[in-house]
Amino acid sequence: MANNYSNSNVKNKVLFKSFNYNSEYFSVGLNDGFKIFKTHPLSLTVDRKLNGGIGIIEMLNESNIFCLVGGGSNPKYKLNKLLIWDDSKCKNIKEFRFNSFVKNCKIKLKKIFIVCEDSISIIEIENFDILETIQTIENPNGICSISKNPNEYLFAWPDFIKGRIEIKNYKYFIRESINKNKLIKKVHESCIEQIELNYNGDLIATASDKGTIIRVFNTQNLNLLNEFRRGNTDAKIYSICFDTNNKFLAVASDKQKIHIFSLEEEKKNKGYFNAFSKVVGLGEILNRSVCFLMDEENVKKKISFFGNSLISINYNGNFTFGNCFLNNKFKNIKKNSIFN
């Protein structure tokens, strides 16, 4: 692929983007099908033309199995359907229909989590049985998160009550104990905008629709561990991610910056920061990003860590890959377009 950065091909605007569990690959849904890329070095591995738009795509680990949902101005499939696609056969192997539009999905080795407008369905892959259906608050953006570790099944979503989240462990699911292994807590005063579990599912980061404060909780009891201030003005939070070592948290917003927060520095400086913040009238919050990456395009994006690097893909198909945390600055920043 050519190493240039362009958004001139607007007709190829990305409809959806997602990383697999270890960020080795990412998937994009397009107006005419979908593509799969290897993250580093950036290379195209799958290019499927389907004569219709794919609005949601999720890869199972590093396999040829994908979840597909239609999208765009000419959807390939009805928006209330989810298809299981086997790319080794280039065909669908299973189809699910729902009473409302599918807004998001997460696929693991044993289970699929399908988020509709006002419900979540958990499906067992072995026999495609529906294990549980959860009625939820209206969730037009499909807000949810799942632990990326293939052996863990912690799943999180917004609760019925504004500002609350629910977390449940589906690793050992028993039909007779639906409400066991579930935690509920109010984490913001306003509506939930983003939630993100770390790799092993022992931490969760949250942001509200105000976008000023990012909070990190442990998932054992939802005790608050960290609070970070992204800024003083409201912002739309596009994406949140942890690095695999739980040293850093990245936050992308519509303020043309991707902030990096140090979880380790926050722990070391917590006493000092809290004391100082009380003096200057900021309550318990003063911790700011240790570095940030300027974003030339104010376009919705998805971010993920890959080793010591941060990856950003936006809806124009532009891809940024940068080594970070070297003297609190980004180094070796590379930009590309998935349409080249």
Residue ranges: model-predicted function:
Residues N9-S18, G53-E58, S100-K106, T136-K148, ...:
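Canonical WD40 repeat/beta-propeller blade segments in eukaryotic WD-repeat proteins
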Residues F26, F66, I112, F155, ...:
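Hydrophobic beta-strand positions that form the internal "hydrophobic ladder"
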Residues N22-S23, S63, L109-K111, P150-E152, ...:
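Conserved loop/turn motif of beta-propeller repeat scaffolds
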Residues N22-L50, I65, V69-S88:
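Beta-propeller domains
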Residues N3-K35, N51-N64:
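Beta-strand-rich domains and repeat architectures in extracellular enzymes and scaffolds
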Residues K89-N149:
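Asp-box/WD-like beta-propeller blade repeats and closely related beta-sheet repeat scaffolds
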Residues K13, G33, R48-G55, M59-E62, ...:
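Terminal intrinsically disordered, low-complexity extensions flanking WD-repeat/beta-propeller proteins
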Residues F37-T45, K81-K91, S119-I137, P158-I192, ...:
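Per-blade loop-tip surfaces of WD-repeat and WD-like beta-propellers in eukaryotic adaptors/scaffolds
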